[in-house]
Design a protein with these regions (language model features):
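Alpha-helix-loop-beta-strand connector modules within alpha/beta enzyme cores
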Residues: 103, 108, 117-136, 189-209, ...
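Glycine/Thr-rich beta-alpha phosphate-binding loop at enzyme active sites
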Residues: 26-38, 174-187, 220-283, 321-326
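C-terminal helical cap(s) of enzyme catalytic domains, especially alpha/beta-barrels
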Residues: 90-107, 244-260, 301, 312-328
Length: 328
């Protein structure tokens, strides 16, 4: 793919390669589904409140294509969190906005996609009858917003649309700066507390709060205290870690934004520190950031995490899922 981009004098762009791979993966899953069907070993189930995860491995919130998510569930993920949805239609940032990087000899991805999505109204219509429910595993509905009011409006619509479903949790994504003013609920603990408490008045669904590794420890600690004050909640620690194109080793002509979020093994140490912090507060934790091996899983488990979110690893080698499951 990069060869043809260079041949045509176009900027290097990973996104067409990912889309091409997704289409062929989906086609292969229809032709030979047995390739992707793996049993989840017994006795690795995790219970979180009233949710049962047959495997503690979960798909992080970065995909919305049902056929790809279904493949990962067939391979043994215990849950999937859908890509963050916002109130209105979003086209995302200009391309190129996705690049492969090499950090300390390990593959990763630099991403500034910008939360493209159809908007909450179309999303709720699609998710109501999605075939993903047929797997019987908890689905995470990730919610973004430019204000506390937008979060609450989106939550209300989701609760109404999914009134006949009970195997899901809500995730408040307060870790992504793709907002109109660049601020998130992480910048205002009082507003976060208001959103959580008003959400709890609307529903008893489990609520996750997804935090950023770019936040300072005092901020994370404050968020942890706020989340802990609301019943039936857990922390998702965390998300991608911001790097400029220079820091990530990407040429400026090959990226439309000044920087983006790095994912992959390079961000694992920071995520591990976050897990330790929230474990000391006493919160249930989903660890997300750089997990790709059984050693990673054991490390975050030892620090107190009970669920393990995966993203880049699913793109680079989805067969790591059954491999890790077999060693849990």
């Amino acid at each position: 793919m990069y060869f043809f981009q260079r041949l045509l004098l176009r900027p290097q762009d990973l996104e067409p390669a990912v889309n091409f791979g997704d289409k062929n993966l989906a086609l292969l899953s229809k032709i030979a589904p047995i390739i992707f069907n793996y049993r989840i070993p017994k006795k690795i189930e995790v219970e979180l409140y009233d949710l049962k995860f047959p495997s503690p491995l979960t798909g992080a919130s970065f995909k919305s294509e049902t056929d790809i998510l279904a493949i990962w569930l067939s391979m043994g993920l215990g849950s999937i969190t859908l890509k963050t949805i916002t109130e209105g239609v979003r086209l995302g940032n200009e391309t190129p906005r996705l690049q492969q990087i090499n950090s300390n000899g390990k593959l990763g991805i630099l991403n500034s996609v910008g939360l493209p999505g159809p908007g909450i109204d179309i999303f709720t219509k699609r998710i109501q009858n999605s075939t993903l429910w047929d797997y019987g595993r908890p689905l995470g509905i990730s919610i973004g917003g430019n204000s506390g009011e937008e979060y609450l409006s989106n939550i209300k619509k989701i609760i109404h649309a999914l009134k006949d479903q009970d195997n899901y949790f809500l995730e408040l994504n307060i870790s992504c700066p793709n907002t109109i003013n660049g601020h998130t609920l992480a910048d205002d603990p009082d507003q976060l507390d208001t959103v959580l408490q008003e959400s709890r008045n609307m529903t008893q669904r489990v609520i996750s709060v997804k935090v950023s590794p770019d936040s300072e420890y005092p901020v994370l600690s404050n968020i942890g205290e706020v989340v802990g004050s609301c019943s039936r909640t857990f922390i998702n620690a965390g998300n991608t870690q911001y790097k400029t194109v220079n820091e990530a080793g990407v040429k400026k002509k090959n990226f439309s934004m000044p920087g983006g979020g790095v994912s992959g093994p390079a961000i694992f140490p920071r995520m591990l520190d976050m897990v330790h912090l929230f474990s000391n507060i006493g919160l249930p934790i989903m660890a997300t950031g750089g997990i790709s091996t059984i050693e990673h899983v054991k490390a975050v488990k030892d620090q107190g995490a009970i669920l393990y979110g995966m993203a880049t690893a699913l793109v680079i080698d989805p067969f790591c899922v059954p491999k890790i499951n077999s060693m849990l």
